[in-house]
Amino acid sequence: MELIEQVSVAKKANIYFEGKVASRSVFFSDGSKKTLGVVLPGEYEFSTSQGEIMQVTSGSFEVLLPNSTTWQTFSEGSQFELAANVSFKIRNNAIAEYCCSYL
C-alpha cells in the first residue's frame, strides 16, 4: 500500500452525485493539496477550476477528455492531466479510486 505521510486530512468528505462520488482533501505542509476519491459505478461530468493530474489508484475509468470524441481507458497506476476551466466525463462499471493532484 502506498502511503501519504505527514499531512492533514479534512474530516468532512466532499460528496457529489447523490453520494456516488466522494473524496477527502489532503493538505501538505508546503500548502499543496490533493484529493483522494472513490467513485461508484456510473457516468459523471466534472469541471476543473485549476489544472489537475488524475491518477487511478484502484480499478479503471473510461474518460472523455476535453475536446475529444473518443473515450479512453485509464487503469490502476495510470494518469491523465487536465487544464484549468475544462469539463470532462468519466464512467466506470465497478468501484474505482483516484488521487487528484492540483497544479
From Swiss-Prot:
Belongs to the nucleoside phosphorylase PpnP family. This is Pyrimidine/purine nucleoside phosphorylase. Pfam families: Ppnp (PF06865). It is an enzyme of class 2 (transferase). It catalyses: a purine D-ribonucleoside + phosphate = a purine nucleobase + alpha-D-ribose 1-phosphate; adenosine + phosphate = alpha-D-ribose 1-phosphate + adenine; cytidine + phosphate = cytosine + alpha-D-ribose 1-phosphate; guanosine + phosphate = alpha-D-ribose 1-phosphate + guanine. Its EC number is 2.4.2.1, 2.4.2.2. The lineage of its organism: Bacteria, Pseudomonadati, Pseudomonadota, Gammaproteobacteria, Alteromonadales. GO terms for cellular component: cytosol. Keywords: Glycosyltransferase, Transferase. Catalyzes the phosphorolysis of diverse nucleosides, yielding D-ribose 1-phosphate and the respective free bases. Can use uridine, adenosine, guanosine, cytidine, thymidine, inosine and xanthosine as substrates. Also catalyzes the reverse reactions. SUPFAM superfamilies: RmlC-like cupins. GO terms for molecular function: guanosine phosphorylase activity; purine-nucleoside phosphorylase activity; thymidine phosphorylase activity; uridine phosphorylase activity.
